[in-house]
Amino acid sequence: MLDSVASKPELAELLTLTKTEQILRLAQINVELEQLSAQERVKWALENLEGEFAVSSSFGIQAAVMLHLVTQQKPDIPIILTDTGYLFAETYQFIDQLKAQLNLNLKVYRAKESANWQEARYGKLWEQGIEGIEKYNKINKVEPMRRALREQNVGTWFSGLRREQSQSRAGLPILSIQNGVFKFLPVIDWTNKDVHYYLEEHGLSYHPLWEQGYLSVGDTHTSRKWEPGMSEEETRFFGLKRECGLHEDDGSEQDGSGI
């Protein structure tokens, strides 16, 4: 698959190019990746992209799909969770459930300051508008994830982002480069129906809060149940933003666009 597009050494060379050069070189590969199934995409990535590999997961509503999809081909792949300390009790229970069911190699990373210490220093950042939310996300999600990628020596990062989830994800490619790491999104073009059928076929569950009306689940204080007329992205961060920062490039010219 895709052998005519780029060899493994040629793919590795992409990491040395500027962002613009990376995007141009990756465009042709992405055209062909779009023609493959999610399982074929994962197989290609494991055979051709830079290791070590890892999957990031928030253990959200549809998390079981990506965790199952990738561990079927690489059972021992590290699963990185950034634990803010403010997850729902049901999320922690879901983590334990999937860890046992799929025998996950779970790696948990947290902020260097505890949740209580952060509140003592900064107050409740999530109540301080967009700037407070961005600071909260940087402390609790972005820094721990970058530390995880560094400590796990990750060369290729798998994520379960889907274009259908929000406008900010609608144009994402399957393969990109984010902050010097290959970013691979094998289910980026899946619909909610595709997700549902996969879960049913493989005996997997939605997050427990799915049945209570949640379409997206993160921290307790910035996740809302869906109500008629709301988009999925409006159920997070009070509708002020969709992304927590994990899947945003740092903006440097050397790194490609990117969980």
From Swiss-Prot:
The reaction(s) this protein catalyses: [thioredoxin]-disulfide + sulfite + adenosine 3',5'-bisphosphate + 2 H(+) = [thioredoxin]-dithiol + 3'-phosphoadenylyl sulfate
Pathway: Sulfur metabolism; hydrogen sulfide biosynthesis; sulfite from sulfate: step 3/3
Active-site positions on this chain: C244
EC number, as in UniProt: 1.8.4.8
GO cellular component: cytoplasm
Principal localisation: cytoplasm
Xref: InterPro entries: PAPS/APS_Rdtase (IPR004511), PAPS_reduct_dom (IPR002500), PAPS_reductase_CysH (IPR011800), Rossmann-like_a/b/a_fold (IPR014729)
Keyword Oxidoreductase carried by entry: yes
One of the GO BP terms on file: hydrogen sulfide biosynthetic process
Domain of life, per lineage: Bacteria
GO molecular function, one term: phosphoadenylyl-sulfate reductase (thioredoxin) activity
Gene3D superfamilies the record matches: HUPs
Subcellular location: Cytoplasm
Keyword terms, alphabetized: Cytoplasm, Oxidoreductase
HAMAP family given in the database record: CysH
Biological role stated in the UniProt entry: Catalyzes the formation of sulfite from phosphoadenosine 5'-phosphosulfate (PAPS) using thioredoxin as an electron donor.
Family stated for the protein in its record: Belongs to the PAPS reductase family. CysH subfamily.
Protein's UniProt name: Phosphoadenosine 5'-phosphosulfate reductase
Gene from which the chain derives: cysH
